[in-house]
Amino acid sequence: MVRAWRQGDAVAVASPDVSKHDRLAVIGAVEDAAPLVRDVLREVGPSYRPFGDEELVRGLAERVPGLRFSASFGWMDTSDVPDLTTTAAWLDGDAGVEALLAEASPKSYAWPGHPGVRRWAALTGERGELLSIAADAWSAPEVGFLAGVATHPVARGKGLSRQVCGFVTAELVKRHRRVALMVDGDNPAAIAVYRRLGYTYRRVAAAGMR
């Protein structure tokens, strides 16, 4: 169950089992957010990981007892439908997805059967084999979410990831009006692909209880 709290200028929203973890999304001034996060974590438990703009999360880690900064990464989003032609399409199921992820992206947060992972899109080869995939996962009514991007090693360097991500982006923008994704800040190649699809980059971070 999603729950929300507010204190002064700060808002915290607890969402269980989102993108591999229990998440506590936080916005607002750190002076209000720190006592709010402290109280909320006492209520919901230490499994929830505060998430928000990097500067805010670093401030929370300095002010909330027992909370430590975990990692920074990128949040990218767009409300534009990409202008590209692609043969990518939604799969009828998830056959072959797990095997491709295991080979091409074993650290993916999105996997078939995981809570919130709704459907997979793919570009396929001549024999129907999966070449590049991406998922609609953890989407909310007003923001779709793209995850689980992977391309088979033999098919890399051909622009397939851009095509399948462009397809999913277009589908989610039409359905939710906005789409977002998370990306490692030290992955410039992926960031460049998403920028070409119209995404803008924002530095975010997560923290966790010791």
Report each predicted region and the residues it spans.
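A conserved beta-turn-beta hairpin within the catalytic core of GNAT-like acetyltransferases
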Residues: 19-25, 138-146, 156
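Short amphipathic alpha-helix that is part of the acyltransferase structural core
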Residues: 72-108
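A conserved beta-strand-loop-helix scaffold within acyl/acetyltransferase catalytic domains
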Residues: 109-150
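Conserved beta-strand-loop-alpha-helix junction that forms the acyl-donor binding cleft
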Residues: 51-56, 153, 180-191, 207-210
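Conserved acetyl-CoA-binding loop-helix of GNAT-fold acetyltransferases
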Residues: 32-41, 151-153, 157-173, 191-196
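Conserved catalytic-core motifs of GNAT/GCN5-like acyltransferases
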Residues: 68-79, 180, 200-210
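Conserved active-site alpha-helix within GNAT-family acetyltransferase domains
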Residues: 55-68, 162, 185-203
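Acyl-donor-binding surface of acyltransferase catalytic domains
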Residues: 9-86
